[in-house]
Amino acid sequence: MDPSADTWDLFSPLISLWINRFYIYLGFAVSISLWICVQIVIKTQGKNLQEKSVPKAAQDLMTNGYVSLQEKDIFVSGVKIFYGSQTGTAKGFATVLAEAVTSLDLPVAIINLKEYDPDDHLIEEVTSKNVCVFLVATYTDGLPTESAEWFCKWLEEASIDFRFGKTYLKGMRYAVFGLGNSAYASHFNKVGKNVDKWLWMLGAHRVMSRGEGDCDVVKSKHGSIEADFRAWKTKFISQLQALQKGERKKSCGGHCKKGKCESHQHGSEEREEGSHEQDELHHRDTEEEEPFESSSEEEFGGEDHQSLNSIVDVEDLGKIMDHVKKEKREKEQQEEKSGLFRNMGRNEDGERRAMITPALREALTKQGYQLIGSHSGVKLCRWTKSMLRGRGGCYKHTFYGIESHRCMETTPSLACANKCVFCWRHHTNPVGTEWRWKMDQPEMILKEAIENHQNMIKQFKGVPGVKAERFEEGMTVKHCALSLVGEPIMYPEINRFLKLLHQCKISSFLVTNAQFPAEIRNLEPVTQLYVSVDASTKDSLKKIDRPLFKDFWQRFLDSLKALAVKQQRTVYRLTLVKAWNVDELQAYAQLVSLGNPDFIEVKGVTYCGESSASSLTMAHVPWHEEVVQFVHELVDLIPEYEIACEHEHSNCLLIAHRKFKIGGEWWTWIDYNRFQELIQEYEDSGGSKTFSAKDYMARTPHWALFGASERGFDPKDTRHQRKNKSKAISGC
């Protein structure tokens, strides 16, 4: 048998397969393709059956033999509300906003910026799908509140630090509402603007235009800061609802000027890509132009602005800015002509807005004020209550013979031009540099002031300890202290009001904060005119009084000079704040020479309790011995004056000019009946028959003098002291 033939028979099938391998591969490929097609058809038919059997909103997908519900897209996972507050207003707004957000079934968190570390946590908001809301207030000198100080410092530094870059917060969504007072024009809502700007510079996306709340009821867009916030909140909730649905409302690309949004135009998205770098460069060069502000309510129109939607050369930015400014001015002029600006500071009826807003009314009512009309108030002094019980009167009783239980403390103007750190009213009253509110007539103010005062006195009828004769006397007002709150001299009809007081045989004690020299010069004669001298240098006055006027120091000096020409009794009121203004003796002496006052009251600051608006504590209240030491040192520098009286209970001393020391006796008290005769003669003569302070002075009793054993306490009354004696913490 041939071996080669056997070998051929063994390998011949394999050789045949090799020769026909192409056809074999082709068959396999066709088979696999057919199998894949069959599987696709089967799955497609199964999916169609599921779509028909299950509601569209809850379609199921078959995955590895299991049924799973299709996940719904989440566009907003929650809202974080950050607040920086000093007096609690921003915190209150945060709570109100949180309630509104909760109604949308969204998780919400309220965060105090004081407890938040942006270095560790702010970057988390890039991917969190949260919307971050910042409610920030502007405080003294345009600075942030204490609670927001670190956050703002960090954010500012990060916005200009190249290590963070322009996209550090890209993906973060935010909105800003600022709280401020346009009376401080140069710093109005500065913190809100800055936070908005810095977030934008770091790449965060603004979901709506910045809101600005204004405490100035006249300039406030909606009449009060609360109304401003409500209007902004409504828009924010509407925007939030749209974001929840995944809708993309047209929002600002960050290239707007002075609240005018350009992003509504066609091609704005392309412009955002192309001109972002140029806008940021221009912003850093001209910060005041605010290219980061926006508004979804206003649009630029016309062909002139189409050029702004394309890439702009850096060299042309100046021309563009001039063009925008010009158009803005033209638009404002057109609005003014059309009467849009006539309603500034007016209500829906076209009348001037009332000074007292609902929130202010609530705050002052809680403090015990009886509010009168739209801008006045009256309150019962604690010394009135004390003297009704026969427990002694205030320092004005000791120094000038006022009957404290017959003294009405009131003001025709709750507004003030300062925000003094030691203000008793915790800065709940409005501020302003001129009268811009609705004005009530002086006759109505005086009538209601007396009625309200009498009603408060009536509440003491039958109260244990109240003396019947004092109660009856208290029903007849004999003195009026225009020192309650605010700046009474701002009231345009203050002279008429004073004349009405004198016609009612009521003496007048008017206190002014030395910021209105012209009004002081034009003031009609009063029984006694006070000027608050809270500091003796420009820097310390700014620190303590926090005035609105930019030229506050010159106004202060001019007010003191205006006092020098007054013929009636004039008084400097010095309030000592420990560690703030007690080391300026020489400067105080120089101020005395400007106004040559008849008297100088030196009083330790009154502690009014804790307040978020003030940093004063009991540590700032000087002991009476410290006040006495200060007065001794001051008198050594002003040779025409001596220490006359003391009221230890009020932590107060009186320095008097030597002209009131006659025959070795002090005549600091007032003959009130004689004053009424003199003022009547003055009025009858049309102002030609003048009189001076010495014409109605009266001898000071021995118990009121400095050095007397009574220390200013009237021996007719019964001394009442608390068991735990401490610093004097209240006064009038």
Swiss-Prot record:
EC top class, in one word?
lyase
Encoding gene, per UniProt annotation: TYW1
Q: Report residues binding FMN.
A: 85-89, 176-208
Name the Gene Ontology biological process terms: wybutosine biosynthetic process
Where does the record place the Radical SAM core domain?
Answer: 400-644
Give the protein name, as stated in the record.
S-adenosyl-L-methionine-dependent tRNA 4-demethylwyosine synthase TYW1
CC cofactor: [4Fe-4S] cluster
Q: Which family does it belong to?
A: Belongs to the TYW1 family.
Q: What EC number(s) would the UniProt record show?
A: 4.1.3.44
Catalytic activity, as annotated: N(1)-methylguanosine(37) in tRNA(Phe) + pyruvate + S-adenosyl-L-methionine = 4-demethylwyosine(37) in tRNA(Phe) + 5'-deoxyadenosine + L-methionine + CO2 + H2O
Query: Where does the chain bind [4Fe-4S] cluster?
Result: 416, 420, 423
> What pathway annotation does it carry?
tRNA modification; wybutosine-tRNA(Phe) biosynthesis
